[in-house]
Regions:
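PAS-family sensory domains
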Residues: 1-2, 17-27, 159-161
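PAS-associated C-terminal cap
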Residues: 26-36
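Conserved long alpha-helical elements within nucleotide-processing catalytic cores of c-di-GMP signaling
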Residues: 39, 43, 52-75, 82-112, ...
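PAS/PAC or PAS-like capping segment
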Residues: 11, 28-29, 81-82, 132
Length: 211
């Protein structure tokens, strides 16, 4: 796609009326592409290609005020990798970076086009599934959890990483990213304390359950 910039100037006669117009057309494709690239980089985690924290927070807050279809909820999940520090320590940071990129690729391929995958920092991510039924959301995240059990082997070394998730279902519009994060973080704490590699769900409508 080419971007063209059109500039016009009015020329006036002695009475002050417009007598004619002259203009120029300039190809600004390179400048426009550079601007689009900078805008994308401002929203993107450069290592993994996921949304960065600022962009993810903003996008999720915008979605939270939108009307939901009957029977649907917004689903907010913190995804925290298990044994990631061990992978870094045993195999080196290049393997850790590789794991982060592979995890994001798996999450992006698994999620719907309207879903958000956001890297908060380190090995912590948010997956946001807007306007979805509880049953479909839980099944989707259960399958994703299974996909994120990844075995890394280097010579005689082997490290298995997995993903623990704290999940919140919300059906109201009077809530923010930060409030959902704090509640999901409490669910994540339960998982980390009991059985890593699984998930715990808090339903703001009043139900709680674990896998």
């Amino acid at each position: 796609m080419r971007y063209l910039q059109v500039k016009t100037t009015n020329l006036y006669d002695e009475s002050g009326k417009v007598s004619r117009m002259v203009g120029s057309i300039e190809d600004v494709t390179d400048m426009e592409n550079d601007m689009l690239k900078l805008q994308k980089e401002a929203r993107t985690d450069l290592l993994t290609g996921a949304m960065n924290r600022a962009a993810g927070t903003s996008a999720i807050n915008r979605m939270l005020v939108q009307e939901l279809h009957p029977g649907c909820v917004n689903t907010f999940a913190i995804v925290d990798l298990d044994n990631f520090k061990t992978l870094n320590d045993v195999m080196g940071h290049m393997w850790g970076d590789r794991a982060l990129c592979e995890v994001v690729l798996i999450m992006k391929k698994h999620c719907r086009a309207q879903d958000i995958v956001c890297r908060l920092g380190g090995d912590e991510f948010v997956v946001f599934l807007p306007d979805i039924t509880r049953e479909v959301a839980e099944e989707s995240l259960r399958v994703l959890s299974a996909k994120l059990h990844i075995d890394y082997v280097k010579e005689n070394l082997e490290v298995m990483i997995s993903a623990s998730m704290g999940i919140v279902f919300s059906d109201g519009r009077d809530i923010t990213f930060q409030e959902l994060y704090e509640e999901a973080d409490g669910c994540l704490y339960q998982v980390k304390r009991t059985f890593k590699g699984s998930y715990h769900i808090s339903d703001r409508a009043g139900r709680e359950k674990a896998d």
